[in-house]
Each structure stands twice: as C-alpha cells, then as structure tokens.
Amino acid sequence: KVDSAKKTLTALNPDVDVVTYDVRLGADNIMDILAGYDVVIDGADNFPSRYLLNDASVKLGIPVVHGSIFRFEGQVTVFDPRGGVTYRDMLPEPPPAEFAPSCAEAGVLGVLPGIVGSIQALEAIKLILGLGEGLSGRLVAFDAMDMSFREYRLQKDPSLEVTWENRDRIEIAELDG
C-alpha cells in the first residue's frame, strides 16, 4: 500500500515530498511518526488503530480529520484535542466485535472511500489555511442509499481522562483487537 500510494501521489504532483512509513503503526512508534505534523488524516479501518491515533494526537495536540466507511455509509469529522471533541468523546469504548464487522466482512460500496476522502481532504485544507467553518464538534454522515447528508453535533465528555489538559499523564498503549 505504501509504495503504491507514494507512486500515485508523486505521479499526480512530482513537486510534493511524499514521506512514507512502511511499518505497522503501534504504541512504540506513533509518537515519533506523528511528531512534527500539523494535521493527521485518519483512514484507519479498525478500532485499535483509531484509539491509538486518538490518544497520540491528544498528547501531541494535533487535530485529526477522521473518516470512516461502512457498507453504504461514510462519516467525516474533525477531532481537535486542544479544546474540541476527540474520538473518545464520540466513542468512549470500542463496540463489541459482533456489532463492528470489518469492511471485508460487511462489504463497502467501492466509491465511498473516494467520497469520504474528498471531504477529508477539503477539511484538511481548511484547517491548514484557517478557512471556513470546519467540522470540529460536528459529524457529517453520508448515506449513499438515499444520497443524503446528515449532520450530528458532538459533545465533550467531561469524565474523560484522555484530554489535552491531562496530556502529560496519557499513556500510549494499544488496544487488543
């Protein structure tokens, strides 16, 4: 995946410096990989990676443009750890495995990654350039079956321990799964 992505991105724009990490993202390397970046675009396809990314981004204070897909639906939001909502605010604990089949098990409409990825790219550009109203605190859900978009307000969970204010106490660890 890494080499293919780099080749494609370089072909689209040879002036872009594409940095790849051909490693499994884990508690042992995520802080080093994310350090120095201004925005993270999350396309993780599993809950352990999403929680790992959340905790590291909160500790580092890096906003995350989150995108997820399932069957005929996609979701996009921006998690802003420096005062905004985070992934753990939206979903404090991973759902039981029987309620969260993988994309391979459940199936995904082939065009959804492109739709969700385009919205994520737009949100990342807005964040970097400081333009428009971003999706921090709001989740946009796309339903391909009826071609509708819905918006949901997200709220901070005041009982959470994994917060920007507690960043020095955050232990980066991997969830089983």
What annotation goes with each model-predicted range?
Residues K1-G177:
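Adenine nucleotide-associated cytosolic modules
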